[in-house]
């Protein structure tokens, strides 16, 4: 009997619903071509949930996600809700609690410069011409963002603020395994990022990553200090395959990787727990200024679906078919407004149609 899967779909705010609609088209094409039994249920999250139910993360949404095999997330937030206390705003009140509730400890952010889009890369043309395909693997639940103690105290010239960087062995081991396993499916190169010349937490990080590497003799490991890594990423991003980072360093480097691709509308992300359950979302925001205008780029949402199929459902063939279809669409000149002049751009919905058609055709 064919196994069936269930996805909790959380479109959210801004461009979320319209780009999610394109992911649904692509999912329909995947079902038909590969015969995978996948059902979906939609739930409110973010600002629309505040408007309808008084909270950015309703209990019904959490319960629906608990019954699912994975979460496909759109985007949340917008000016309408910025007057609320920070903890009640869509971003902090929805996404962070979901990550905590499902113990999502690893964040995977692919950053790729697609052929034909080199002109959008802010790097020098000779660097962009080499292309790059990087996977940033970021530890998501440890480090300085969560370490204790943290706070402020004192007054006058003695007023001070403090945060604490803490990492446990098990936290470093499990994120390192994610990086090495991911590298095996790519070019088998891991670059671990730390500040082991200064920080005790980074010394432990480097020691443990080196130990874990022994279980992956087919994967090449190197280490870079964070300051050098940021420079090397600008100098020659093509040298990197998988970048393994702590929470703070990954936060910085994953955004740097995103920026040098030239369009946030192309970048998916995955956040996973130890059981393979994941939340998949575009790396960009809700872009309320372009919502409802049929000009948003849906590719990040569609590629987030591909990551979901690969990491949570184990459907590598279907994931590769989506990625190939995106490649084909771009190679044949299909562009949304962020990647083209207004005169030759296609809309959000048409881009979804094109990619779904290519998935169905195996193009």
From Swiss-Prot:
Mg(2+) binds at residues 227, 251, 255. Keywords: Amino-acid biosynthesis, Branched-chain amino acid biosynthesis, Cytoplasm, Leucine biosynthesis, Magnesium, Manganese, Metal-binding, NAD, Oxidoreductase. Substrate binds at residues 99, 109, 138, 227. It catalyses: (2R,3S)-3-isopropylmalate + NAD(+) = 4-methyl-2-oxopentanoate + CO2 + NADH. Its cofactor is Mg(2+); Mn(2+). Its main location: cytoplasm. It is an enzyme of class 1 (oxidoreductase). NAD(+) binds at residues 78-91, 285-297. It is found in: Cytoplasm. InterPro entries: IsoCit/isopropylmalate_DH_CS (IPR019818), IsoPropMal-DH-like_dom (IPR024084), Isopropylmalate_DH (IPR004429). Pfam families: Iso_dh. GO terms for cellular component: cytosol. Binds 1 Mg(2+) or Mn(2+) ion per subunit. Its EC number is 1.1.1.85. Pathway: Amino-acid biosynthesis; L-leucine biosynthesis; L-leucine from 3-methyl-2-oxobutanoate: step 3/4. The keyword Metal-binding applies. One of its GO terms (biological process) is L-leucine biosynthetic process. The record marks 145, 195 as: Important for catalysis. It comes from the Bacteria. The keyword Transcription does not apply. GO terms for molecular function: 3-isopropylmalate dehydrogenase activity; magnesium ion binding; NAD binding. Homodimer. Catalyzes the oxidation of 3-carboxy-2-hydroxy-4-methylpentanoate (3-isopropylmalate) to 3-carboxy-4-methyl-2-oxopentanoate. The product decarboxylates to 4-methyl-2 oxopentanoate. Belongs to the isocitrate and isopropylmalate dehydrogenases family. LeuB type 1 subfamily. This is 3-isopropylmalate dehydrogenase. It comes from Pectobacterium atrosepticum (strain SCRI 1043 / ATCC BAA-672).
């Amino acid at each position: 009997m064919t196994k069936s899967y269930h996805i909790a779909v959380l479109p959210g705010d801004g461009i979320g619903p319209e780009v999610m609609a394109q992911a649904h088209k692509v999912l329909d094409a995947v079902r038909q071509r590969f015969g995978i039994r996948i059902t979906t249920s939609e739930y409110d999250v973010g600002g629309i949930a505040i408007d309808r139910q008084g909270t950015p993360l309703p209990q019904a949404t959490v319960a629906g996600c608990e019954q699912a095999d994975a979460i496909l997330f759109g985007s949340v937030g917008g000016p309408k809700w910025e007057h609320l206390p920070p903890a009640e705003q869509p971003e902090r009140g929805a996404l962070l609690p979901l990550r905590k509730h499902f113990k999502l400890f690893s964040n995977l952010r692919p950053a790729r410069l697609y052929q034909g889009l080199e002109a959008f890369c802010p790097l020098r043309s000779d660097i962009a011409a080499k292309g790059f395909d990087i996977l940033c693997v970021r530890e998501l639940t440890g480090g300085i963002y969560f370490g204790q103690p943290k706070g402020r105290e004192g007054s006058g010239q003695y007023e001070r603020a403090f945060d604490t960087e803490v990492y446990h062995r098990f936290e470093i081991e499990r994120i390192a395994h994610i990086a090495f396993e991911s590298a095996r499916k790519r070019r088998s190169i891991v670059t671990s990022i730390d500040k082991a010349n200064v920080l005790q937490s980074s010394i432990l990080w480097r020691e443990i990553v080196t130990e874990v590497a022994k279980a992956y003799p087919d994967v090449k490991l190197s280490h870079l200090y964070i300051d050098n890594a940021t420079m090397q990423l600008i100098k020659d991003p093509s040298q990197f395959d998988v970048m393994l980072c702590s929470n703070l360093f990954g936060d910085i480097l994953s955004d740097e990787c995103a920026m040098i691709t030239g369009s946030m509308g192309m970048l998916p992300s995955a956040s996973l727990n130890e059981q393979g359950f994941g939340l998949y979302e575009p790396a960009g925001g809700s872009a309320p200024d372009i919502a409802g205008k049929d000009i948003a780029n849906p590719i990040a949402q569609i590629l987030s679906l591909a990551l979901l199929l690969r990491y949570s459902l184990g459907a590598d063939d279907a994931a590769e078919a989506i990625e190939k279809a995106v490649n084909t669409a771009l190679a044949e000149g299909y562009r949304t407004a962020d990647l083209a002049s207004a005169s030759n751009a296609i809309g959000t919905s048409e881009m979804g149609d094109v990619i779904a058609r290519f998935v169905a055709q195996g193009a």
